[in-house]
């Protein structure tokens, strides 16, 4: 406070402690102080700084509320009086009311699903029984059963330090695991626990590695590339890459055992797929008792995919009459009628056909199959 201001403050009518500056004293560049009673000449300046500090703190708290709009659990300290406290309290009560409404509202499930929070909680009481030796405890949820097995039975043996699975009926109860996590993964085959769930679909897995491989089916990631020079193929798991690398070598130990088929494969799964094809899976099942013996024959039809062969009979008694039958093709699920009739002076040389859409034998006997409209005998062809 300058000399003029002190003199005015301490003399004349202003000696009572009320500061009233002269007219025109303040300029646009001077901020007027609070007009109040002061016991000390510098106390008004300290209160003025404190007022600005409170305004600055209030501004920071408002900016923080804008940056993080989630209302706090407890009401904040009142800053600007009763009005501000009342507004803050109303916001908190509104947020709590929404949370209570969410907690009280029942969860709706589709008609074809069970009303449980997770798949691990679905099931009856008999599904969550501990079949460990000398333990028959029943649990309400699968999570409780898994936690019981983990805490109670996953204990190392005192004799050799290995972890043994004592689940009733386990085939490797006498072969211990050298690590605790390995036994816990194994026990999931008994408890049916699948804690690793895909966040993109509804599938769950018992091992984290299987979930990691499954997620690659969503992302399209194929980190396992073929090491053969010039091959650009890649796979999502190492087992598929191993099957592929054997195609570059001549090693094909799995051979088709169907007579006349020379196909060989590098892995048993490919051989099983080959055997299940239409070429090797034709089975003729008579819906009526056979009155005539089955004879080797040739199916004459307009479609190449209709080629097949009836099984040969051990003896042929009578071949003068004809017998009708019906042929079912799995490709179109439409029946075709044909009849067995003798054909005189037929000369067929034994041979074997293997094409893309036909797989049949030709024999030298004097019978063949001709498409017809008669159908008293029902012979069906089924896939394996």
UniProtKB/Swiss-Prot annotation:
Stored PROSITE patterns: ZINC_FINGER_C2H2_1 (PS00028), ZINC_FINGER_C2H2_2 (PS50157)
Q: What Pfam families does UniProt report for this protein, alphabetically?
A: zf-C2H2 (PF00096), zf-C2H2_15 (PF23561)
Induction statement: Strongly and rapidly induced in larvae by maltose, trehalose, glucose, fructose or saccharose, but not by lactose or galactose.
Major localisation: nucleus
UniProt-recorded Gene Ontology molecular function terms: DNA-binding transcription factor activity, RNA polymerase II-specific; RNA polymerase II cis-regulatory region sequence-specific DNA binding; zinc ion binding
Kindly list the residue ranges recorded as spanning the membrane: none
Task: List, alphabetically, the SMART domains matched.
Answer: ZnF_C2H2
Q: Provide the protein's localization.
A: Nucleus
Q: Which residues form the C2H2-type zinc fingers?
A: 128-153, 163-190, 196-218, 224-248, 254-280
Keywords assigned by UniProt?
Answer: Developmental protein, DNA-binding, Metal-binding, Nucleus, Repeat, Repressor, Transcription, Transcription regulation, Zinc, Zinc-finger
The similarity comment for this entry is: Belongs to the GLI C2H2-type zinc-finger protein family.
Q: What does this protein do?
A: Transcription factor which represses a set of lipase genes involved in fat catabolism.
Name the UniProt record assigns to this protein: Zinc finger protein GLIS2 homolog
Please give the organism.
Drosophila melanogaster
